[in-house]
Regions:
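Helix-terminus/linker motif at the lipid-water interface of multi-pass membrane proteins
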Residues: 32-50, 119-126, 182-187, 250-283, ...
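Transmembrane helical elements of multi-pass membrane transporters/channels
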Residues: 18-37, 138, 149, 199-203, ...
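Residue-level hotspots within the lipid-embedded alpha helices of multi-pass solute transporters
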Residues: 27-31, 64, 104, 108, ...
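N-terminal transmembrane alpha-helices
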Residues: 8-39, 43-44, 60-72, 76, ...
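Alpha-helical transmembrane segments of multipass membrane proteins
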Residues: 35-39, 117, 147, 151-155, ...
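Short alpha-helical transmembrane segments in multi-pass integral membrane proteins
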Residues: 1-23, 77-142, 178, 186-243, ...
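Small-residue-rich hydrophobic transmembrane alpha-helices
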Residues: 49-109, 146-165, 260, 273-337, ...
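Short runs within selected transmembrane alpha-helices of multi-pass transporters and secretion channels
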Residues: 70, 138-157, 165-176, 192-208, ...
């Protein structure tokens, strides 16, 4: 491959930054509001924080499934818009809405059916089981709105509109704090769930309005809907792209649930410290997710337009930026974490343990950034199967295996040592896949028949 001059590279770096910045700012705003949210719950005591921490991995599991549904359809939207087929993109949107709401309804019923038993299954202390159960119940009721928000946000991002989702998701965080201040004093831990659910409901409907009625590429047309009915090929492609992501999310979140079960016997202080450490770390890695979203959009649209070399270059630029950004935020958090934990909880023992664990995890931030952004770039090409297998092997073999060996002797720091090691392994695996994947060449320019070729290489 020929060398690229900085003069040629500069506008591409600028484009990545312009697309990434709104998403990064949204993620930062989201985490700041989560800090406030955690502090509001933390003021109720360590047991309240532990109750939410106990079921948090289970909420991530259900959220991961909704994310996989969004990925299966949003990548197709990016490809169609990149190829100049707006009508095709709108057809994908229609199919995505129907499918996503059906899946969300099933997940909602499933969550409601297990909420009372879940804290016991997870090995939670009897003192926190009731609050944990009620919090998870409210989360389950929120799933249809969460799915609607995730789907329409990803559609807008893949159409090139990064600003609208950024503004609305930031607004959701502000509403969350407002609603929490109303509900937490009256309902305690469950009030935090009610506040989040209320904010999500308001913003998800607003996001749907912006996507389905206002976006020039995606707004739905009744005549188009009547003319173009059900297309099984769209669902087939969504399944081939989204199913590996869904299986990955389920297996990875299941591993995180197992990790929670490993931590739970350590007591409420360790559970609360782990929950706060995860919240604090998210300020470092959420910007990586913002750049990863930009990578999916830029790679997907250029692959759809047949510009495969440019697509891969954008992916590489995003990976370097993501790793660099997260290295900086990780270094800052290394020094600032005592201040952060003093805001989140008044419990000194929780603060000390959370800071000790977090500093171990921060050592892996640059390679964690590589894994996040590389996954976004590969998703833009439709390459989801092999990255999912790599992620699954990494978290189950490395993280859980090391955790079982280390937690008994070292407690919570042992769990975070296992996690940091696994994140480094995952970053190296994803970097290797970005370098060797054939998916950038699978999608040939302009031909409709080339689209299935993108999805036939799950084995490659």
């Amino acid at each position: 491959m020929k060398k690229i001059s900085w003069h040629e590279l500069k506008p591409q770096v600028k484009e990545v930054w312009v697309l990434s910045l709104p998403a990064i700012l949204t993620q930062i705003t989201t985490i700041v509001m989560q800090y406030i949210d955690s502090a509001m719950v933390g003021s109720l005591g360590a047991n309240a924080s532990a109750a939410i921490g106990l079921v948090s991995t289970s909420t991530w599991l259900l959220g991961g499934i909704t994310y996989a549904v969004s990925a299966g359809f949003s990548v197709q939207v990016a490809h169609n818009i990149g190829a100049g087929r707006d009508a095709g993109a709108r057809s994908v949107v229609r199919h995505g809405l129907c499918t996503a709401l059906c899946v969300a309804g099933i997940l909602c019923v499933l969550g409601l059916s297990i909420h009372s038993m879940l804290p016991t299954w997870l090995g939670g202390d009897p003192a926190i089981r009731y609050d944990a159960s009620k919090y998870f119940m409210v989360y389950a009721l929120m799933i249809p709105f969460s799915q609607l928000n995730s789907l329409n946000s990803s559609f807008l991002q893949c159409s090139g509109d990064m600003l609208t989702p950024s503004i609305l998701n930031a607004a959701m965080c502000l509403l969350d704090v407002v609603f929490n201040s109303i509900f937490i004093p009256h309902f305690g831990v469950m009030g935090a769930g009610i506040g989040t659910a209320s904010a999500c409901a308001v913003i998800s409907l607003t996001m749907a309005w912006r996507c389905l009625l206002c976006n020039p590429h995606l707004r739905l047309n009744r005549k188009e809907t009547e003319k173009h009915g059900f297309d099984p090929e769209i669902l087939k492609k969504a399944l081939k792209i989204g199913l590996p992501v869904g299986v990955q999310e389920i297996a990875m979140c299941s591993a995180q649930v197992v990790a929670t079960m490993i931590i739970a016997p350590l007591g409420a202080v360790s559970i609360a410290a782990n929950s706060f450490a995860v919240t604090a770390e998210s300020l470092c890695y959420m910007p990586g997710y913002g750049i990863g979203s930009a990578a999916t959009t830029l790679v997907g649209r250029n692959v759809g337009a047949g510009k495969t070399d440019l697509a891969k270059r954008y992916g590489n630029i995003c990976i370097v930026m993501g790793a660099g950004f997260m290295a900086i935020t990780g270094l800052l958090m290394m020094f600032l974490c005592p201040l952060v934990f003093s805001i989140l909880t008044p419990d000194l023992s929780v603060r000390a343990l959370a800071a000790q664990a977090l500093r171990i995890g921060l050592l892996a931030e640059p390679l964690y950034g590589v894994s996040i952004v590389a996954a976004g770039a590969l998703r833009g090409t439709g390459d989801t199967f092999v990255p999912s297998v790599m992620n699954l092997g990494s978290i189950w073999v490395v993280r859980i295996g090391l955790a079982l060996l280390l937690v008994g002797n070292f407690g919570l720091p042992g769990m975070w040592t296992a996690m940091a090691t696994e994140l480094c392994v995952r970053g190296l695996l994803m970097l290797y896949r970005q370098k060797t994947t054939k998916y950038y060449k699978k999608y040939n320019k302009t031909t409709e028949t080339s689209e299935p070729e993108l999805l036939e290489a799950a084995e490659s």
